[in-house]
Swiss-Prot record:
It is a peripheral membrane protein. Its main location: Golgi. InterPro entries: COG6 (IPR010490), COG6_C (IPR048369), COG6_N (IPR048368). It is found in: Golgi apparatus membrane. Keywords: Golgi apparatus, Membrane, Protein transport, Transport. It comes from Kluyveromyces lactis (strain ATCC 8585 / CBS 2359 / DSM 70799 / NBRC 1267 / NRRL Y-1140 / WM37) (Yeast). This is Conserved oligomeric Golgi complex subunit 6. Acts as a component of the peripheral membrane COG complex that is involved in intra-Golgi protein trafficking. COG is located at the cis-Golgi, and regulates tethering of retrograde intra-Golgi vesicles and possibly a number of other membrane trafficking events. It holds the Pfam family COG6_N. One of its GO terms (cellular component) is Golgi transport complex. Belongs to the COG6 family. One of its GO terms (biological process) is intra-Golgi vesicle-mediated transport. The gene is COG6.
């Protein structure tokens, strides 16, 4: 309210003239005697603009208003009054001019302490002017410059202050409840304020510049475009989805499937980021559902295709498939291979259809009453191998025909095998699908085929026929493998088992044949091998000859050598021959006969098995078996030599002396006459007396020596079959006798030099005469 006391508070300009106090009436100043100043009217400040660009404009405005309200005053002043004043005032001044100056100073003084700005003072005056009727103000009294004006202004100030205080009191009383609430909420508000302050502290670094926001907006727009592109590339259109579910299976259908597989591949990348995992899972789920629908349609299409083809083939024979249909079929097959369950069900269905048809065709070949067959397969007891071959030949023809069909249908065309196709992930599984199906189909037929063949193999006991069966089975196994049948398939396993069975039947049938032979034969007078052994060797040689011709080496096992060669000779033959000559250990003559029949038997073995030495007996074990046979043969010959040598010395009465000299030093090792001295110690033996020697040797020597050659060749060794062995035995025995006769006679001459006549009468043959009698040249 300080503006109401403006006359008392205004600071005059230092350069202006001194003015009377505001409590003095301006009328007391008789500056203008000619005309009394009219009543001053306060200008309506509300009608004037209050907005100025600067202080100078404001001053100019109010100065013009003041000058307009002041009339020109008379310059004629009374000399009495103007005289004292004219010294102090340079020009006359009116009351209106003073008031205008006061108001102008009030409104334009920037340093007035009671006001904060000119706008507030102007606003106060405008409010006072607008409400003067409500306040009942008398402006004439308020602006009066006398004491009454001062009192009115002070009274107005007091009224306004009381009114303001009452208004403020009412406002404060009304705000007490609000203050209480604010006080109650001050704690939470303070905490909120602190939290906001902390939040402001943390967000002080955030820069919300326009360029940054604009760049962010551009990024979001670009991201939106990318997302739209991704959405278009990772989703199916309504037309594509409808064609996938209801459309024809054609190139467009396969293009949609390729798109689905592409989407699935890209969706897996979304799973690598935690932010996009849920999107990737949802996308994969949707695409998998679409693939399930498409795989069901493809499965039904493939089944209908094969069933239709099979039906037409039964009615009109094997049909050919068009290129377009075959391409759609194989492309569908490629896409179905991604679903293991549907694909395996389809393959099982194919295997079932084809195997049933082939089984019917196979069984119909054995129907004699089937008039459609020109030549049914009939089992013949006279030619079981022919029946076996016919069955295998028909099986082979079925495999060849089925392979051609499967190859034309399931072997993928080269243009379908591309690097960017679905096949690249399934090539290992679907690449040789026609061969896999072929093996699966004939796996279903394997048991039926095995039953037809096993009845021949299991009940055939002829080793020759069994060998033919082995060859037939081995040949067809090789042919079937060449035409796509796996060696590990059930059909090949069955054929291999039958081959092994037939191979084992060869050994078992030969051993059964040997067991059935009559071995209760008496000793032959000619000391030839037993008849049963001759028959067995003949059978065995025929078998070995066939094995050699057919180059069948897998049957040449250790078991075959043992059961067919060693056991019959070592157990059956040797025991049988020993039973023929039970006194061979005691009687030298029986032992000679036993050795001769053994040599004859081994010579027969050698003649029968010798031709197979480099073929049948080429294996390590075969060589050892053949070596054992030769060793036994040589051992028998050696034993016969020793026995015949002993028989010769015994027949001439010189056996005791021969043994005595060999105990001292082997006769065979004597080189010259110097070695004779080693036998001089034999004189100490009683049998070395000349009289005893004469009694033991003279008569037997003269009796047997002339007959020795005929006795050896025509009696004892007459039945020995190998002439070389006979010649070797004769020459060895006679040579030993001549050498001993010479040494023995020379030693006696050294021991008894004075009894030369006695020695000559006992050993009355010279060395040359003995050599001549025995037919051996004296060396």
């Amino acid at each position: 309210m300080d503006f109401l006391d403006f006359p008392a508070l205004v600071v005059d300009e230092s350069a202006a003239l001194p003015q009377p106090a505001s409590r003095l009436s301006l009328a007391s100043l008789r500056l203008n005697d000619d005309e009394q100043e009219a009543k001053f009217v306060l200008p309506n400040v509300s009608k004037h603009d209050t907005e100025f660009t600067d202080l100078h404009s404001k001053m100019k405005h109010f100065a013009s208003i003041s000058l307009g309200e002041i009339r020109p005053a008379s310059v004629s002043l009374s000399k009495e009054v103007a005289a004292p004043i004219s010294n102090n005032i340079e020009k006359p001044t009116t009351t209106n001019q003073l008031l205008s100056k006061k108001i102008n100073s009030l409104l334009n003084v920037p340093n007035y302490a009671s006001y904060t700005s000119d706008s507030e003072t102007k606003r106060a005056l405008q409010i006072l002017d607008a409400n003067h009727s409500d306040l009942g103000l008398n402006f004439n009294q308020l602006v009066a410059s006398d004491f009454v004006g001062t009192l009115n202004r002070k009274s107005l100030r007091s009224k306004l202050e009381n009114s303001m205080l009452n208004s403020h009191s009412d406002i404060l009383s009304n705000f007490q409840s609000i203050a209480r609430r604010i006080k109650r909420l001050s704690g939470p508000l303070e905490r909120i304020n602190n939290a906001m302050q902390n939040f402001k502290d943390t967000t002080e670094s955030i820069d919300f510049e326009f360029e940054h926001v604009k760049d962010r907006l551009d990024q979001l727009k670009a991201r939106r475009q990318v997302i739209i592109k991704l959405r278009d590339s990772l989703t199916l259109t309504q037309l594509e989805l409808d064609h996938l579910q209801n459309g024809t299976i054609n190139d467009l259908f396969f293009q949609i499937l390729n798109k689905i597989n592409f989407i699935k591949e890209k969706a897996t990348y979304l799973l690598s980021n935690e932010k996009t995992t849920s999107a990737g899972v949802a996308l994969l789920k949707t695409m998998n559902n679409n693939l399930t629908v498409s795989n069901k349609r493809i499965y039904n299409y493939l089944i209908n295709f094969i069933e239709e083809y099979d039906t037409l083939s039964r009615q009109y024979g094997e049909r050919t498939i068009g290129d377009e249909s075959l391409s759609n079929f194989q492309t569908s097959l490629i896409h179905l291979s991604n679903d293991v369950q549907f694909f395996q069900d389809f393959l099982n269905r194919i295997v079932g259809l084809r195997s049933k048809r082939l089984l019917d065709d196979f069984l119909s070949q054995f129907d004699i009453d089937n008039k459609k067959l020109q030549r049914p397969i009939i089992l013949s007891a006279h030619d079981p191998v022919r029946y076996l071959g016919d069955v295998l030949a028909y099986v082979h023809s079925m495999i060849v025909n089925e392979l051609e069909f499967l190859k034309s249908t399931f072997k993928l065309k080269s243009e379908l095998v591309t690097s960017d196709s679905v096949l690249k992930d399934n090539m290992d599984f679907i690449g040789d699908l026609h061969l896999k199906l072929l093996n699966e189909i004939f796996t279903s037929l394997a048991n039926t085929i095995r039953i037809r063949l096993e009845q021949i193999v299991r009940f055939e006991n002829n080793p020759m026929l069994n060998l033919d069966i082995v060859q037939c089975l081995s040949l067809y196994q090789m042919m079937l493998v060449k035409n796509g049948i796996n060696e590990s398939s059930q059909l090949m396993t069955s054929l291999n088992d039958l081959e092994n069975l037939a191979r084992s039947k060869i050994v078992s049938s030969v051993t059964s044949y040997l067991k059935d032979l009559d071995k209760n034969q008496i000793a032959a007078a000619d000391l030839l091998p037993p008849d049963w052994f001759v028959d067995y060797l003949s059978k065995l040689s025929q078998l070995l000859n066939k094995l050699e011709q057919q180059n069948e080496t897998r049957i040449l096992t250790d078991d075959l050598y043992d059961k067919l060669i060693l056991d019959p000779i070592n157990n059956n033959l040797v025991l049988n021959l020993q039973n023929w000559f039970p006194t061979a250990k005691k009687e030298k003559s029986a032992r000679i006969d036993l050795l001769i029949v053994q040599i004859n038997s081994f010579d027969l073995v050698k003649s029968k098995l010798g031709p197979f030495h480099s073929t049948i007996f080429s294996s390590d074990y075969g060589k050892s078996v053949f070596s054992k046979l030769e060793t036994q043969y040589t051992l028998c010959v050696t034993k016969l030599k020793e026995t015949m040598n002993s028989y010769l010395f015994e027949s001439t009465g010189m056996e005791l002396y021969f043994n005595l000299f060999n105990m001292i030093f082997p006769i065979i090792s004597v080189q010259d006459e110097l070695d004779y001295d080693m036998y001089l110690s034999a004189v100490e033996n009683p049998i070395m007396k000349l009289a005893v020697i004469h009694d033991n040797i003279h008569e037997k020597l003269n009796t047997y020596l002339p007959l020795a050659v005929s006795d050896f060749q025509d009696v004892k060794l007459f039945n020995l079959m190998p002439p070389a062995v006979e010649e070797d035995i004769v020459s060895t025995c006679f040579g030993n006798f001549i050498k001993f006769y010479k040494v023995f006679k020379s030693v006696l001459n050294k021991i008894y030099p004075e009894d030369e006549e006695m020695i000559m009468s006992t050993l009355n043959f010279t060395t040359n005469e003995v050599s001549t009698l025995l037919g051996v040249e004296d060396k």
